[in-house]
Each structure stands twice: as C-alpha cells, then as structure tokens.
C-alpha cells in the first residue's frame, strides 16, 4: 500500500489533507547531481536506455524535495525510435530523427513496436523504479501525444514553422490521419505496458497541440487524445490508474478534454485556473499551472504566486481545493535554482494544508 497516495486521490477528486505537488522535468539539468550523472554516462540516450541510470535519475529529485510523485525519466521520442526512425541528440539543438516520415509509403512501413522487446528498457526501468520507491510515492509513466509525436516524426526534429506536417494536414489529410492512427495504437500499447510494469498514474504530453488552429486541433489532436482516454484500459477501484492529458495552449479546449474520458487535464500558465475549473465543470481534476519562470523569483514572490494559483483554482471550483494537483505550466529549465524549488514545494505544502 502506498505511504503517500495524495496524487492518486487528487486525480480522482477525492479528499486530501493538502494539495499534492510534482513538477514536469523534476529530474533534469537544473540539478547538479543530474549533470554529474549525464557527464558520467556520456549521452542522454545512454541514461534513458539503461534502466539502472534511468532509475537513479528518476529518484534524484525525491532525495532533495518532499514531492508527492516520481515521474519516469525517459523521452517522448522513444516510440518513434523504436519504430525505426533513428533518434539521436545534437548538442545545443535537441533531438533529431534520422528517418523522418514524409509520404504514405513510409507510413505503411511503420509498425507498433513490441513493448517488451524494442522498448523493454523502458519497462525494466519502470519495474526497477517501483522496487526502489518501495511504495513511498506513486510513479507516473508517460507518452507524447499522437499529434506531438507526429510533429517530430514528420519534421525530423523540433521546428519553428512545422511546415512539413502542416502541408500534409492541408494537402494529404488522409495520409496524416493514417500516421496518427498508427501512432495512437502505439501510444495506447506503450501506456498500457507501463501500467502493467508498475506505473500508478499516466500522463500524455500534447506539447505541440497549441500550434494548431481550433479547427485543426479538433481534427488532428483532440480525436486521438479522446481515443487514448477511452481505449486505454486503466482498471477499477484500488487498481485504477488515472490519466492526465496535458497540453500547451489547450485552454480553449478544456471543456472538450474534460468530456474525453480522462481523469485529469493538465494546463499551462496561459489560462487562469479559475477559468479552467469553470470550463471543466467539475468533470475532471486539474493539474498546473504555475508559470515556470516564477522560479526565477525570490522565495517570497514564489509563495505569493503559489497562493494566487491555489486561490484561483478554488474560485473556479466552488471554493474547494479538491481535485487539484499543483505543477508548473510546463517543464523545469536548466538555469533554475534548486533552492527555489525547495521554496516552491514548502509553500505549496504550507499554504494548501486543509
């Protein structure tokens, strides 16, 4: 039995003694111990593909901060890599895929990878982390969203214009839907395998959903998020594994995401939580949504913004703080001060206590 189940209770909108907190990219370059591990390993991919290293890095922030969850150390591009698109990282530029998808012929050659073969290192990491956590806090597994993965798979990496995928959306939408359906199948299998290996909550990162117009979002992102929420087997009762759908720029679609079948919606800092809570109408828990740049502020300023965020959620939720998971609106960045993270966690714990 979990010693700390606040996260799972909050995601189910049950009563908790205080608002739980975890942070996107809580294991990352802002931590000196992470940088030391990265230097010793020699590459990001070696860390992500070696279960013992992935476990160590996952646990690093838990040793520093009294967080309410661990999140698997990995990368959303492990699925495209396992599909044969040859993931590599270029220093200072980020991830690149050596075999981008540009036509229907390439899509027909894609297959959903075997989760205990091509992606066994991820599942072994999940199993090892669960063992090392020893039921102290829940472990979150994750995947990129179909749209976000397709962006990388078609562009071959990050992009400012997303010209290739947007051209495909306008000129060959059936081809893009074919890719999105294949990727959705892979995401569902990937998350199910993480759950089977021991993940106790799951999150989908729709990082690039916000680049789409409303019509395009409702055509190329939302239907596939909904498929995941409705088709991913998550169990019942004490064996239930809650799902969070997080997206940058998803504010206009919260009401629709709340009806997708997910347990929770993660939002960025471009919408007030009060507004998000009203739009979700009590159908889902909400996760977020402190601007990550707040961590560049003083501890007093951080505490002030924590209070404002907590109050904003309650104002939109009938005065109640239940059903809220505190998080940033996006991930930690390398220049952040670990002491300011400590101040953030302390403020959330102190100010949210019931």
From Swiss-Prot:
It is an enzyme of class 4 (lyase). Its EC number is 4.1.1.37. The keyword Plastid does not apply. It is found in: Cytoplasm. GO terms for molecular function: uroporphyrinogen decarboxylase activity. Homodimer. This is Uroporphyrinogen decarboxylase. It comes from Xylella fastidiosa (strain M12).
């Amino acid at each position: 039995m979990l010693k700390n189940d606040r996260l799972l209770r909050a995601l189910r909108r049950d009563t908790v003694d205080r608002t739980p907190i975890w942070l996107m990219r809580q294991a990352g370059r802002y931590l000196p111990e992470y940088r030391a591990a990265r230097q010793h390993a020699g590459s990001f991919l070696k860390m992500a593909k070696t279960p013992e290293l992935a476990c160590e890095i996952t646990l690093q922030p838990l040793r520093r901060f009294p967080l309410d969850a661990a999140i698997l150390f990995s990368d959303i591009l492990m699925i495209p890599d396992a599909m044969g698109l040859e993931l590599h990282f270029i220093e200072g530029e980020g991830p690149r895929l050596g075999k981008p998808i540009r036509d229907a012929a390439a899509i027909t050659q894609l297959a959903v990878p075997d989760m205990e073969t091509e992606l066994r290192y991820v599942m072994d990491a999940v199993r090892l982390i669960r063992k090392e956590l020893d039921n102290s806090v829940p472990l979150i597994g994750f995947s990129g969203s179909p749209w976000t993965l397709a962006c990388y798979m078609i562009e071959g990496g990050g992009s400012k214009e997303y010209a290739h995928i947007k051209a495909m959306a306008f000129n060959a939408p059936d081809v893009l839907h074919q890719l999105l359906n294949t990727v959705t199948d892979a995401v569902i299998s990937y998350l199910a395998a993480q759950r089977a290996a021991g993940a106790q909550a799951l999150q989908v990162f729709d990082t690039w959903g916000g680049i789409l117009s409303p019509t395009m979002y409702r055509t190329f992102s939302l239907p596939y998020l909904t498929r995941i929420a409705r088709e991913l087997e998550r169990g019942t009762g004490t064996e239930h594994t809650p799902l969070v759908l997080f997206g940058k720029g998803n504010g206009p679609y919260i009401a629709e995401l709340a009806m997708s079948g997910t347990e929770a919606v993660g939002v960025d800092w471009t919408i007030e939580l009060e507004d998000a809570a009203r739009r979700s109408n009590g159908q889902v828990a909400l996760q977020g949504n402190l601007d990550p740049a707040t961590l560049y502020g003083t501890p007093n300023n951080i505490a002030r913004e924590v209070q404002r965020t907590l109050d904003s959620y309650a104002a939109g939720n009938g005065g109640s703080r239940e059903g809220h998971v505190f998080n940033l609106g996006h991930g930690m960045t390398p220049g952040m001060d670990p002491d300011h993270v400590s101040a953030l966690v302390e403020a959330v714990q102190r100010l949210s206590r019931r």
